[in-house]
Amino acid sequence: MFKLPPISLYIHIPWCIKKCGYCDFYSYVNKSFIPEKEYIDHLLKDLEKDLSLIKEREINSIFIGGGTPSLLKSSSIKKMMREIKKRINISNTAEITIEANPTTLEYKRFFNYKKSGINRFSIGVQTFNSDLLKKIERTYNKREAILAVEEIKKINKNFNLDIMYGLPNQSLKDVLLDLQYAVKYNPTHISWYQLTLEPNTPFYVKKLNLPNENNIFKMLVEGEKFLKQSGYKKYEISSYAKLNYECQHNLNYWNFGDYIGIGCSAHGKITQINGDIIRTIKNKNINDFMNGKYLKHKNFVLKKDKPFEYFMNIFRLYKPVLKRQFEERTNINQNYIKEKIKKAIEKGYLKNKIDFWDTTKKGKMFLNSLLKIFLD
């Protein structure tokens, strides 16, 4: 019998306080025209439509993302979590995360989130520098960011801080100061990533004064050194965690696990008992979604595409790639890719061991070139 991978649940909440110029996630600024109660009801109906694909499988993690899901009333989170638990099996040890904007953090409401089952919070600080916050169009200042982090510490030990580098006119000193502020509050996890300008975003067409490649490299080297000295282990390209506090939900993504995606524009990946992999994309048109048209697209992943999709995720992690896991997650014998593996080894991107493949420093540095081998 084919061994199914672990499975998670992603819930998309599409509204925001303000759409930032660099953001390419699907969201609406005006919350009022999407009734909160009705949207939660449709989320649950969307979930019900997917139940036939997962049968009785146990959910190992839940991630409530957006948008800004922390705009939800605590009563809405309570209802949503209660009703989800009626419909699916959730592990007693499941990690349940909600993303939050610092300006939405209210002690009582977030404490009630915790009472409803949320056991991990992810706070999108981005930077503690008020001038830089203005430049990236965030709606709060340094003082408000600090107050938010201080509040979340009172509510829950397990929390992540999102911090960015490579911001407009940002210096190395600015970068290290941000990280010093972050570790001061002892988060269990820090997501530290470079600002990237995605097509079809306002920042993409603006001529922003971003740090050059040499300065970005210095920021990365010095920042990683500081985080390591502060007790945070790098386990993924932009993820750093205290011991045993890696984000389980994201680890499942990167290990090519399964996940249901519910809500506007949510994506899903669900493996079937015969080894077939189904990809789902939910409707991003809010009016269609609120009229019950949840599923936009569903397709099977072709055999030839599975290796690329697997490696695109697993190579983000700083760990060896088990050959056994490749076969288990793709339902493909490793001999199917032996010529491509050979090419990657010849180019110095991979090392081949008896039970695993390991990316070299060169492979991590030129990850896109490594992945292209499996795309050709």
Curated annotation (Swiss-Prot):
InterPro entries: Aldolase_TIM, Coproporphyrinogen-III_oxidase, Elp3/MiaA/NifB-like_rSAM, HemN_C, HemW-like, rSAM. [4Fe-4S] cluster binds at residues 16, 20, 23. It is found in: Cytoplasm. Its main location: cytoplasm. It holds the Pfam family HemN_C. Its cofactor is [4Fe-4S] cluster. Residues 1-236 form the Radical SAM core domain. S-adenosyl-L-methionine 2 binds at residues 67-68, 126, 138, 162. GO terms for cellular component: cytoplasm. Keywords: 4Fe-4S, Chaperone, Cytoplasm, Heme, Iron, Iron-sulfur, Metal-binding, S-adenosyl-L-methionine. GO terms for molecular function: 4 iron, 4 sulfur cluster binding; coproporphyrinogen oxidase activity; metal ion binding. One of its GO terms (biological process) is porphyrin-containing compound biosynthetic process. SMART domains: Elp3. Probably acts as a heme chaperone, transferring heme to an unknown acceptor. Binds one molecule of heme per monomer, possibly covalently. Binds 1 [4Fe-4S] cluster. The cluster is coordinated with 3 cysteines and an exchangeable S-adenosyl-L-methionine. Might carry two S-adenosyl-L-methionine binding sites with only one binding to the iron-sulfur cluster. Belongs to the anaerobic coproporphyrinogen-III oxidase family. HemW subfamily. This is Heme chaperone HemW. It comes from Buchnera aphidicola subsp. Schizaphis graminum (strain Sg).
